[in-house]
Amino acid sequence: MLEKINKPNDIHKIALADFPQLADEIRQFLIESVSQTGGHLASNLGVVELTLALHNVLDLPQDKIVWDVGHQAYTHKILTGRKEGFKNLRKEGGMSGFPKRCESDCDTFDAGHSSNSISAGLGYVRARDLLGQNYRVVSVIGDGALTGGMAYEALNNAAELKTNFIIVLNDNNMSISKNVGGMSSYLSALRTAEAYTGMKLNVTKTLKKVPKVGTAVVDTMRRTKSSIKQLIIPGMLFENMGLTYLGPVDGHNMRQMMKLFNEAKRVEGPVIVHVLTHKGRGYEPASLHPDQFHGTGPFDIKTGRQLSVKKGPTYTDVFSQAMVKLGKENPKLVGITAAMKEGTGLRAFEKAFPDRLFDVGIAEEHAVSFAAGLALGGVIPVVAIYSSFLQRAVDQMLHDVCMQKLHVIFAIDRAGLVGADGETHQGNFDLSYLTMMPNMTVMAPKNGRELEKMLEFAVHAAGPCAIRYPKGTAYQGLEEFDSPIRFGKSEVLYRGEKTALLSVGRMTEVCEQVCKELKNKGENPTFVNARFVKPLDTELLDELAKDHKLFVTVEENVRNGGFGEHVAAYMEACHPEVRVLPIAIWNRFVEHGEIASLRAKIGLSAPDILDAIEEYEEQE
C-alpha cells in the first residue's frame, strides 16, 4: 500500500479496507527509518491512524493541519510525498524532523515548541473568514501540551469568536486521566453516536430560531443536563468554555475516527475531538518505554538499544549528580522542571527528595513565577529548563525574579548548538536575553567539573543566577585548571602577550585547539576562560589592556547582545586602543545538522576562528 502514496491526497485512492495494512506498513517504515537516522519515534507511532483519518476527511493543501510541537508529523510527511526525505531525516541539508513550510505547502506552520497550535490555527480561521474563503482548519494538540497556559488562552478566544474550527486532542494518557466506569462508557458512546450528535445540532439550530425564548431554552437545557455529565465526562470542561466536545474515540480505530471527524465538520463553531492514542504502538520497546523513544538516536531494532556508545557523563548527568549531592547538604534546595524530568536530569533528585521536586507541566512562565514565590518563602529553587524553552519566560525572569533580586537559580540546559532538532531548539539566544536583565548573574562552565562548582557557588550566592551548559558529553579537559569560583572573576588559563582569546563555556574546548595552533605558528596568546558573562571581569580586561593589542571573544550565541558585544562596548569606552574581534553566530536561526558540521558552516570551528584572526590581523 505504501508504494501508492507519492503525493498529497493519494490516500483518497486507498480503499478503507486497506487502511489497516497501510498503517502497519507506515509503522514498519518509521521504525526502520528512525532506527537508522534517529528522531522522534514513540509519538509518531501513536498517531498513524489519527493522521490517516485526518488526511482522508480533509483536502490538503487547501485544508490546513496545524501540528502542536510538530515532532509527531512523520506520517503527515509520508502522506504528503516525502518518503524519500527520511533517508536524511534531521541531517544537514536533509528533511527536518518538524513541519517546515519551505518543505511542502501541506505544512502550514513551522513548529517545534508546545501549546501554540490552537492560537496559530485560530489565526488561520479568522483570516479565512475575513477573506471570505472556504477551507477547514484543524489543530492537533497533545494532552501534555494542554498543561501550557497558552493553549487555554487560545481555547477561551476560540469559544468567544464562535467560528468553525476543529481541535483534535491527541490524548496518549500523558496528562489527562482516562475515563472509567460503565456510565462514562455509555455516555461517551451516546455522545459520539451519529444520531445523537445530529439530533443535538438540529434541535439547537431549531430552538435558536424561536423568537425571544429560543436561546434561553437552549441555555436552560445545557445547564440542566450538565449536573451529571460534569461529574463523568471530561469534555464538560470544554463545553462550559463554549466549545462543542466530541469523544473520546479510539485513536487506532479508523472507522470511528473518520465518523467523528466528519461529524466535527458539521458542527457550527469550535469543536474539540478527543482521541485516545497509545505512544509507541506497534513497537514493543517504544510502547513499554515511550520516554526513551521520544527523541532517540540510531538504535538496534531487535533490542531497542542505542547504537551510539556513551563516551562519558553528559553535562546533564553532571548537573543531575550535583543536584542530589547539594540536596543532601541543604534541605532548602528544591528543583523545578517544566515536564522535562528526564531531559533535564532531575529524575534522580526526585527519587532522592520526592517532596522537593516540582514538575509544573509545560508551563515555563508559571515555573519561573512559582520559583519566585518559593524563594520568597525561604527555599532555594533551581529551575532546570532547556535554553530555547526558557525564552517563553523572559518577562517572568525580568519582572518577578530580577526586579525583586530573588535567589532563584536557572540551570539552562541545551545552551548553544543542539544539532538535529534544528532552529526551534538551538540555544543561541540565552546570553543575549539574560545579560540585559538587571541583577542577573550569568555563568558558563568550561567542563563538567566547573559546572559542579558553579552550581555549588550559585546555591550559596545571593540574587538570581543563571548557568548555561550544552547538550552532550561533558568536556573533561583542562581539569588541571581548577581555581575557586569567585563572583565576576574569569580564569586565566595561559598568560601570553599581544592577543587575548576570551572564550565562553563549551567554546573553551574549541579555543584550546586554536591556542595550540597559534603557538605552533610562533605566537603566544593569552587564553581566558570567561566563566562569568555577567558581570564582566573588568579588572582583568583593564589588566590585559596594558600589554595586548587584540581581544578575540568566542561564544556559541548570537552576536547581538552577546558576550563579545559587551566586551567590545567596555573596551571602546575604557580602552579604545585595544581592538576587539567578536566571534559568534550572526543574527540568524541555525538549521538542523551535526554540531561539528554546523560550527564549520557558521564560522565557529577551530580552523574558522584561526582564519578569522589571521584575516583581521592582515586588515589591520
PLM features per residue range, with description:
Residues 173-319:
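Long, well-ordered, tryptophan-enriched scaffold segments
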Residues 298-302, 306-311, 419-421, 441, ...:
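Peripheral docking tails and interdomain loops at the edges
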Residues 217-285, 407-412, 431-480, 606-620:
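Structural signature of the thiamine diphosphate
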Residues 40-161, 315, 332-333, 337-338, ...:
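Cofactor-binding active-site loop characterized by glycine-rich and histidine/acidic residues
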Residues 259-262, 294-295, 304, 314-329, ...:
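Glycine-/acidic-rich phosphate or pyrophosphate-binding loops and their flanking alpha/beta elements
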Residues 38-47, 66-71, 99-118, 141-145, ...:
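Active-site nucleophile and cofactor-binding loops and adjacent substrate-binding regions
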Residues 64, 269, 277-391, 396-406, ...:
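Non-catalytic terminal/interface segments that mediate subunit docking, oligomerization
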Residues 1-79, 243-258, 274-277:
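N-terminal amphipathic, basic-rich helices that act as targeting or association modules
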